[in-house]
Amino acid sequence: MQSVAFMIDLSIKSLRGILMKQIKRLFQIDPWKIRTTHLDKENLRLQESLTSIGNGYMGMRGNFEEHYSGDHHQGTYLAGVWYPDKTRVGWWKNGYPEYFGKVINAINFIAMDLQIDGQTIDLATTPYEDFSLELDMQNGVLSRQFTIQTPKNKVRFSFERFLSLEKKEAAYIHLTIEMLEGTGTITLHSKLDGDVQNEDSNYEEHFWEEIAIETQETLGFVTTKTIPNNFEIERFTVTAGMRHFIDGASVVPTYTQQPLALTAELTVSLNEGETTAITKEVLVVTSRDVPETQQITRVNELFSEMTTLYPEAKAGQAAAWAKRWQLADVVIEGDDEAQQGIRFNLFQLFSTYYGEDDRLNIGPKGFTGEKYGGATYWDTEAYAVPLYLALAKPEVTKNLLKYRHNQLPQAIHNAQQQGLKGALYPMVTFTGVECHNEWEITFEEIHRNGAIAYAIYNYVNYTGDQDYLKDAGLEVLVAIARFWADRVHFSQRHKQYMIHGVTGPNEYENNINNNWYTNTIAAWVLRYTRESYLKFQEETTLKIADDELAKWADIVENMYFPVDNELGIFVQHDTFLDKDLMPVSDLPLSELPLNQHWSWDKILRSCFIKQADVLQGIYFFNDAFSLEEKRRNFNFYEPMTVHESSLSPSIHAVLAAELGMEEKAVEMYQRTARLDLDNYNNDTEDGLHITSMTGSWLAIVQGFAQMKTDHQQLKFAPFLPATWTAYSFHINYRNRLLFVEVAADQVAFTLLDGPAIPLTVYDQKYTLKDRLVLPIRKEEVHV
C-alpha cells in the first residue's frame, strides 16, 4: 500500500521541464496570424498541418499550389466522403468489423504549376528569396509569397486562397505575378487532379476511378467515383469544376486531359514593372448532395451564381468570419502566446464544423490529415459539445446529437455483434457501424457509450430543451442503459455489480477490471435514464417494464467502485495500486513521449497514465465530489499522467483551476492551447488535434472563469492568471448573450441580449439585468 506521503510527494513534482521538451515552433507569435518568413523543408509536413484551412464542407492541408518535389503530404478532404478499406489484422477475432473506414484524399483542385520562360518553379530545388507564408485567422485566407531570380528576370509570385463560408462548394485561388526586373513569359498549368492516393494507403492503392472529363470553353470539369468495395457501402461521386480570370476578365485556356485529371494552360508575358493577377475559381459537389448524373449541371448553375470578382468574394469571406468571431472570440491581454493559441484552436474548430449538416460529426483530425481514418470518435461528445453549446446556436449542438440518434440502429447492431442487448456506439465510425479493428478498443473501451449519453444530458441541462429529451434523446438513453445493464455482472463474492474486461480513458492499460470511470458513468447512465423515463412515462411511446426499471435501480445502488480509504482516492481499477508507482518527472526526458520510445508491453505494465481517467469522471460529475476528494485524486493521479493524449491537458487545467493550483492550471492551458502550434506531442505533422482544440476554451471558461451550469444554474468564480492583464469572452445561454470580462481588480458581466437571468458569482446570487461589476476574489494559491 502506498503512503499518503508518497501521494503528497508526487503532487509537488513539476512537469515543466517535460512540457518544454522538444517544443518545435515554426511560426511567429501574433494574435491573429500564423506567419513565417522561413520555408522549413525539414518540417514541411508540420507547416502544412498548421496552415490547413476548411469551411465545414471541405478542407485541405497547407500545400503549395505549384509543383513541389520535396517531402510533403498532399491532402484535400471532403466532408462525409470516405472508403471502407478491408480490415487487416494478424489474428481475427469474432466481433471485429469487416472494414476500416477512412477519409480519402480527394481531387487536388489547387494545383497551379508555374514556369518562367519554360523553367519549372519547384521550391524544393529552385533558388528563391523573400519567402513568406501567412494564415490570417480573421478571414481564413492563406497567403504565400516568394521571388524567383533567373539570368533574364526577377519575378515575384503572391498566392492567396480560401474556402468560402458564403458558398460552401466554392474555393478561390488568386495569384499575383510581378515582373520586378527584365521581361519574361509565365506559363501556368492549372489542374483538377483526381489521380491522388492516401498517405496511409495499402500498396499505393488508389481509391478513385474516372467517370468523366469535360470542357465548355471557360469551364473545365472532372468527375471521379470511389472504386467498388466488397461491403455494399455507398460509393461517392465527386465533380470539380474550374474557371479562370486574368485581371478580372474570363479566359478560355488550352485544355489537356490526363487520366483522372484536366490541365488548363494559361500564358502571360510581362515587361519590367508590370503586374498581372490570375484567379482560379473552383466548385466541388459530391453525391452526398447531388446525384452523379446532375453534378456537371449543378456546377454550371453554381458558377452562374458567382458573379462577383475576387476582391468582393474575399471581402464576403472576411465578413462571414467576422460574424463568427463576434461571438466566439476570446480576448487575452498580456500574453500573445496564449492569445494566438486560443484563436488558432477556435479558427480550426469552426473551419471543421459549424453544425450545418446533421449527417456530419467532428473527426479528430478534421480536414488536416488522415490519421485515425478521419472518422468520428467519442471526443466530440465529451469535449466539443460544451464549446458549441456556448458559442453557437443550440441547433448546432442538436445536430451533433441527431447524428448519433440517426445511427441508433447501427449502435444496436454493434451491441449484438458482442452478444449484448441495447446499443453500443462505435469507437470509430462514419455511418454508426464500428470501424475500429483493435480488440482492446473495439470490444473494451465501452466507456464511450457513456459520453454519448452525457452529451444528451449536457445539451438538455444547458438549453432546457426538454422536448428533445422526450422526443429523441430518451430513445438513445434507454438503448445505452440496456447495454450497461447487460454488460455488468453480479459478483456473488462481493454482492456487488462489476464490469470486467475494459479499457478506460487511459488507453495505456487494457483488459482491466472495474475501471472506476467506466463503472461510474455506467451507473450514472442507468440513473439518469431511469429518472428521465419516469418523468416522461406518460408522454413517450417507449415502454420499460417495472422489473427492468427495478433492475437498473439495483445496479445503481450496488455498483462496485474501487476506493482506497488510506489514500482517500478513487482507484483507477482493481490492481492499479499494485503497480510500481512513480511520477513522470522521475523518467529521463529522452524516453518521452512513451508511445514513441517504449514497447507496448512496457507501457501497459507501467503506472503512467495517457490522459485523465479518474479525473475525467470527477470533471463530468463535478458537483458530486467534495473539494477534498478532488484535491486528493488530482494530487495522486496528475503526477503520473504523461498527457500523451491531446485530450488530457484541458481536464487537468479545469480541475487545477478549481483547486486553486493556478500555476498548474496555466501550465496545462498553455499545453492545450499550443499543443499543435508548438508540436508538444511530436505528431502534428500527421494533422491537427481538432477535437481536443476545445480544451483551450474549456480551460479558460470552465477553468479560469469557473463557469458551471450545475442544476441548470449559471455560476462563475473567476480568477486572473498572473501573467495576464485581462481576458474576456461571450457566452450563449438559454436565449441570452452574456459578455464576461475579467481584469486584475474586477469581473464584469454584461447581458447583451435576452431577458434578465439569475447568476451566481463567488457563491453569491444576483440577477443580471444589464451589467454587473464585482471585485475579483483573490484566492489562496495552492501548489
Swiss-Prot record:
Superkingdom of the source species:
Bacteria
The record's InterPro entries line, in alphabetical order, gives:
6-hairpin_glycosidase_sf (IPR008928), 6hp_glycosidase-like_sf (IPR012341), Gal_mutarotase_sf_dom (IPR011013), Glyco_hydro_65_C (IPR005194), Glyco_hydro_65_M (IPR005195), Glyco_hydro_65_N (IPR005196), Glyco_hydro_65_N_sf (IPR037018), Malt_Pase/Glycosyl_Hdrlase (IPR017045)
The kind of enzyme this is, by top-level EC class, is: transferase
Q: Name one GO biological process term.
A: maltose catabolic process
Q: What pathway is it annotated to?
A: Glycan degradation; maltose degradation
Q: Enumerate the Pfam families for this protein.
A: Glyco_hydro_65C (PF03633), Glyco_hydro_65m (PF03632), Glyco_hydro_65N (PF03636)
Enumerate the catalysed reactions: D-maltose + phosphate = beta-D-glucose 1-phosphate + D-glucose
UniProt similarity note: Belongs to the glycosyl hydrolase 65 family.
**Biological function:** Catalyzes the phosphorolysis of maltose, leading to the formation of glucose and glucose 1-P. Does not have maltose 6'-P phosphorylase activity. Plays an important role in the metabolism of maltose taken up via the bacterial phosphotransferase system (PTS).
Q: What is this protein called?
A: Maltose phosphorylase
The species this protein was found in: Enterococcus faecalis (strain TX4000 / JH2-2)
